[in-house]
Curated annotation (Swiss-Prot):
Family indicated by similarity: Belongs to the thymidine kinase family.
Residues at which ATP binds: 16-23, 89-92
Pfam family, one: TK
HAMAP family noted in UniProt: Thymidine_kinase
Active site residues per record: 90
Organism taxonomic ancestry: Bacteria, Bacillati, Bacillota, Clostridia, Thermoanaerobacterales
Protein's UniProt name: Thymidine kinase
EC number: 2.7.1.21
Cysteine pairs bridged by disulfides in the record: none
Subcellular location field: Cytoplasm
UniProt keyword annotation of ATP-binding present: yes
């Protein structure tokens, strides 16, 4: 990725299913910016507390400190003037105001790196992610490996008690006992009834 002068702002988006390495890639980009002596601020939605409330944590345990926010506009309120790079994990959990927040920060001449799921467990566009992708200068769509057949996986399979979640189940489950797997288009199952 060639960024050129950052005085005009830049939006990067990292998407894909669970287990595709989105948070790991986000952390890698953050660390590279820090090595280059760029000031970085990292944000995440407060609803994402599966591993830590104040860290972005990948499934393999790699982590970096983050500021947890409830509402997207808090990112602008907490943004420090000399920050050059802003990283936002799990963007799908924010409401659609995250689109305007990301745009506003980029318009300040900042590099904004967002990561999140582009599709929900149904295989449908997830929250504001598609709209953030649309305004980005760069989108990287990562894949995982399908646990059923070994092909590239682009979808997240939700399992409840070992069975595929039904289409009408809630999109976001907080504190539920569900598990997830990476699946390809063919092996992804979402029963309608």
């Amino acid at each position: 990725m060639i960024y050129g002068s950052l005085d005009h702002g830049f939006i990067e988006v990292i998407v894909g299913p669970m287990f595709s390495g989105k948070s790991e890639e986000l952390i890698r980009r953050i660390k590279r910016a820090q090595i280059a002596k760029q000031k970085v601020q990292v944000f995440k939605p407060a609803i994402d507390d599966r591993y830590s409330i104040d860290k972005v944590v990948s499934h393999n345990g790699t982590n970096i400190n983050a500021i947890s926010v409830v509402k997207a506009f808090e990112i602008i309120e907490l943004l420090e003037e000399d920050t050059e790079v802003i990283a936002i994990d799990e963007i799908q959990f924010f409401d659609h105001s995250i689109v305007d927040v990301v745009r506003e920060i980029a318009d300040l001449g900042k590099r904004v790196i967002c990561a999140g799921l582009d599709m929900d467990f149904r295989g449908e566009p997830f929250g504001p992610t598609p709209d953030v992708m649309a305004i980005a200068e760069s989108v990287d769509k990562l894949t995982a490996i399908c646990v059923k057949c070994g092909n590239p996986a682009t979808r997240t399979q939700r399992l409840i008690n070992g069975k595929p979640a039904k289409y009408d189940d809630p999109i976001i489950l907080v504190g539920a006992h569900e598990t997830y797997e990476a699946r390809c288009r063919k092996c992804h199952e979402v029963p309608r009834t």
